[in-house]
């Protein structure tokens, strides 16, 4: 797992942090109830931040595809798939934790209901599902559907349900 952490480039990490820090500027602080409301109603988070992260994860899978023969030879096919999947889930959960923490610190936790917390859990599970679709690209030929489908799911769920 530790060698895979080297694949997280400082440049990618800095770009994501800058995009997260821009949330208050883009969404404006006025008339916003709490951080979950911001998460679901902000087009910036869905259109820019989430898609940027999905594209970055897709690029990581493409790097894994280039290294797949070496990794499979050293670790075995099953161990390689498990390690890469765990890596992607951990990075996704880390991203969501940073995003949720920042939104909580900036916008607070007022007017919270069980319905909003349930929506937050559903949003997180949806995001993990999108990452799983990207993960399916591992050890296969490059196909644009593996990135287009998560982006379409992200947009449809944002505009139809949230």
Per-range role (PLM):
Residues 1-13:
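Aromatic- and glycine-rich beta-strand/loop motifs that create alpha-glucan
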Residues 1-4, 151-162:
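Short amphipathic alpha-helical segments
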Residues 11-17, 45-48:
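Alpha-helical transmembrane segments
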Residues 15-32, 158-162:
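Alpha-helical transmembrane segments of multi-pass membrane proteins
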Residues 16-20, 142-157:
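Central hydrophobic cores of alpha-helical transmembrane segments
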Residues 25-49, 55-57, 83-140:
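Secretory targeting signals
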Residues 61-90:
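Helix-loop-helix units of permease transmembrane domains in multi-pass membrane transporters
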Residues 68-78, 103-111, 143-149:
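Alpha-helical membrane-embedding segments
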